[in-house]
UniProtKB/Swiss-Prot annotation:
The lineage of its organism: Bacteria, Bacillati, Bacillota, Bacilli, Bacillales. InterPro entries: Macro_dom, Macro_dom-like. SMART domains: A1pp. CDD domains: Macro_OAADPr_deacetylase. Residues 1-175 form the Macro domain. Belongs to the MacroD-type family. PROSITE patterns: MACRO (PS51154). SUPFAM superfamilies: Macro domain-like (SSF52949). This is Macro domain-containing protein lin2902.
Length: 176
């Protein structure tokens, strides 16, 4: 599996599925969540409302998949990252679960490429370096366990220079 890092707009990625850093209500909001909902069009909100009507809410660490509306991608996986409190409330485990469950959902649909944003590092306040370490470790661990998966490319789409630098540094190290 190839793991790449780019700086850019996740809504413009030409991959099978993009991951949305969603809130528990899946109703859009600020940051990447709002950008994805706006770019995908009104049908996405309708589909998300149907999902929430069925499941109630999507708690931190969980993920659901929907169609992608007007995006280049075919699907959107809505992963609800944890709000950072102090690191003593399972935040890292919940963040890892977002990545793991997103990969499971993508593989379950035999998709080959997936793009992740920097989940929980915006208004949710997760420390960027720790979030990058969790993301890369989890993706690599998943790839080891699911070596015969359909997924051939994982792309991290960074929204700022700080995340881009962190990911590039970590991706080239053996620490993660």
């Amino acid at each position: 599996m190839d793991i790449t890092v780019v700086k850019g707009d996740i809504t413009e990625q030409n991959v099978d599925v993009i991951v949305n850093a969603a809130n528990p209500g899946l109703l859009g909001g600020g940051g990447v969540d709002g950008a994805i909902h706006q770019a995908a069009g009104p049908d996405l909100l309708k589909e998300c409302q149907e999902v929430i009507n069925r499941i109630g809410s999507c708690p931190a660490g969980e993920a659901v998949i929907t169609s992608a509306g007007d995006l280049k991608a075919h699907f959107i996986i809505h992963a609800v990252g944890p709000i950072w409190k102090d690191g003593e409330h399972q935040e890292a485990n919940k963040l890892a679960s977002c990545y793991w469950k997103a990969l499971d959902l993508a593989a379950g649909k035999d998709l080959t490429s997936i793009a992740f944003p920097n989940i929980s590092t915006g208004v949710y306040g997760f420390p960027k370096k720790l979030a990058a370490e969790v993301a890369l470790y989890t993706v690599r661990k998943w790839a080891e366990e699911e070596y015969d998966s359909s997924i051939k490319e994982v792309r991290f789409v960074c929204f700022d220079e700080e995340n881009l630098t962190l990911y590039n540094k970590l991706i080239n190290s053996e620490v993660v």
